[in-house]
Every structure is written in structure tokens, then in C-alpha cells.
Amino acid sequence: MYTFVVRDENSSVYAEVSRLLLATGHWKRLRRDNPRFNLMLGERNRLPFGRLGHEPGLVQLVNYYRGADKLCRKASLVKLIKTSPELAESCTWFPESYVIYPTNLKTPVAPAQNGIQPPISNSRTDEREFFLASYNRKKEDGEGNVWIAKSSAGAKGEGILISSEASELLDFIDNQGQVHVIQKYLEHPLLLEPGHRKFDIRSWVLVDHQYNIYLYREGVLRTASEPYHVDNFQDKTCHLTNHCIQKEYSKNYGKYEEGNEMFFKEFNQYLTSALNITLESSILLQIKHIIRNCLLSVEPAISTKHLPYQSFQLFGFDFMVDEELKVWLIEVNGAPACAQKLYAELCQGIVDIAISSVFPPPDVEQPQTQPAAFIKL
């Protein structure tokens, strides 16, 4: 009999994983403070990593990788992409971005030196001079100059400003209490018809204890309800596809898709009929490339291969597609929720791939085959 503890009661994904484990008859749930467990389904930000792997005779597995915030916090992701040898030169799939600290945090400002991309040595260095240099160059060249400011730890569409005025963006950040990222706004996204609407794509990615990377075959488009207008920055519903914003502010929420969600099968049909292309060839190939590059760049820093405990983690990668069908990474979520209709299959995949590979069911003699719902990258 294997044992597990649950330390995060708010995760709907791990509530379902917990239910599936108990249903096998091979797992027993212990009190959350019991140290003698095989599996910890923990809370993302307060995991006791230092205490894991020290129970004699017990293999211990936890559902997060220590250090994965390098990918999952917006400012850390920008720094990773600019400083990682694997990404800095070849990364063409991430919008131009700058890390800005509010002036009230008393952060040293990096001086601009004949260029836009700074070498980031001080992890708390503010990049506003580099942003302004790029902003002014674009203004002189007559390029599109819309930017978006986003709180590094923000979620659900909070702490966001879209503007074509550099001073407005910097003033907005300087009145906040935490680090922000200023990112070049995708002014010409691929739009859905009818409705001339924006969307983003959520892909779920599972990394097992051996750092094998699996992409969940199903993905979801989170769609806007209102027609897109690049010059109307005040109307968040045409710019931001977060469920919270669409549901609260758009009178057309649910008009085009139930819950403003479109799944890959329907999206593929749309691409085939509207653009004569397929999802796999035009978009998924790019998505797979970006996911691999991101996760492999942090592997040396977060892998548990030589630690006394083991990890796995589910990530949510969010993408946008521009009108040239180029895919852009927007952000990575380290504790993603899941569309309601996908819970059963996604969570069964977590059990089969990430948990049963470490703790095989005692009545299974043959090695388990990879679930068809996941693609190994």
C-alpha cells in the first residue's frame, strides 16, 4: 500500500488526482503533517523541499520542481530568456520584454549602452532605460508602438495596462508594489471569425521525475467575446482573453463558444475551412519546439535526478498566434487549472505517467504504456 498526503486543498487538479489514487485501492491518504509518505501533493509556494527524501526506506515524490518559478514568474522568464545560453541567441518566439521595478523598491537602474538588450548581472536591475531606447527607436521608425505592462506575479488579468505611451506605462508601474514586465504587444494577432476576436492557446505539459516532457494532446483556446480594436486600450474585453475578465465585463460572454472555450478539434476544423491549413502543421509544431526549448533550458537548475527525493510537475503554457501564423509564448503557469471536460483524462494521465512510473500498481506485471492522450516530446 502506497501513502500520500495532500497539503493543497484548493487545487481542483490534485483533488481529482487524489480521488483517482484512492479509487485504485493501492493508495492510502495520510494526515497532511505525517512525514512518512510516498507522495506529497503539496502547495506550490510553501513546499518543505529541504525535508523531503530523508525518511529511511521511503521513496518520496512531490508534485512540483523546486526552482520552476524561473519559468513561471513573468520577470524570471524574461531574465531566463535573455541570459540562458540556449535561448538568448535563438529565441524568436518571445515578445520583446523588459523587467521594470517600481521606483519605490529602490532598485538600481541599468544604464543604456549603445544597445537594447542588456547583459543582466544584477538580478534586481531595472531595464527602463533599455525599454525607452527601444520605444524611441520604434517611434522614430514609425513602427507599431503598443506595449503591455504586466505584474510579474499577477493572474486573472489583474495588474495590466496596455498603452502606446511610455510615460503612462512607467508611471503605472511606479505606483505598484511589485516588479512588472513591459512587453511588446502583439498588434496583429490571428483573429477568429465570426466576430473578429482575439484568442490565446493553453497547452498542458507534464514533466515526470526523469525529466521526460509530455504534451497533452488536447488544448483549449480562450476566446474574446468582443471585436478586436488595436487602438481602443480601455476596452479590456477585446484585448484580454482571461475568463474572469470576459465573464465579468462582456455582455457577449458565451455568445460564440460555450464558456468562451474552443477545443483543438473545432479549431482545426476552423483553420482548415478558413485558411486551408491544419493545426498540427501550422501551429502545434511551433508549440512543441517552444515547450522543449523552455523546459530544457531550466533542466540543469531544477532536475531532481541527483537529489534524495523526486519531482514531477504539470505546467500550463500560454501562446498567441499572429496573423502570419507565428506562435508566440506569452507565459508559463506552474499550477494550471483545467477545462472542466478535460479533468478526467488529464488527471488520469498524471497518475499513469508521473505517479505510477515511480510507484507501479502491485498487480501490473507489464510495463505501462504511455497514455494516448499525451505525446512525448
Curated annotation (Swiss-Prot):
GO cellular component, one term: spindle microtubule
The EC number(s) this enzyme carries: 6.3.2.25
Transmembrane segments: none
Keywords: ATP-binding, Ligase, Magnesium, Nucleotide-binding, Potassium
Classification via Pfam families: TTL (PF03133)
Record field: catalytic activity: C-terminal L-alpha-aminoacyl-L-glutamyl-L-glutamyl-[tubulin] + L-tyrosine + ATP = C-terminal L-alpha-aminoacyl-L-glutamyl-L-glutamyl-L-tyrosyl-[tubulin] + ADP + phosphate + H(+)
Residue span(s) of domain TTL: 3-370
Biological processes per GO annotation: microtubule cytoskeleton organization; positive regulation of mitotic cell cycle; post-translational protein modification; regulation of axon extension; regulation of metaphase plate congression
EC class: ligase
SUPFAM superfamilies according to UniProt: Glutathione synthetase ATP-binding domain-like (SSF56059)
Family: Belongs to the tubulin--tyrosine ligase family.
Subunit structure of this chain's protein: Monomer.
Name used for this protein in its record: Tubulin--tyrosine ligase
Lineage: Eukaryota, Metazoa, Chordata, Craniata, Vertebrata
Gene: TTL
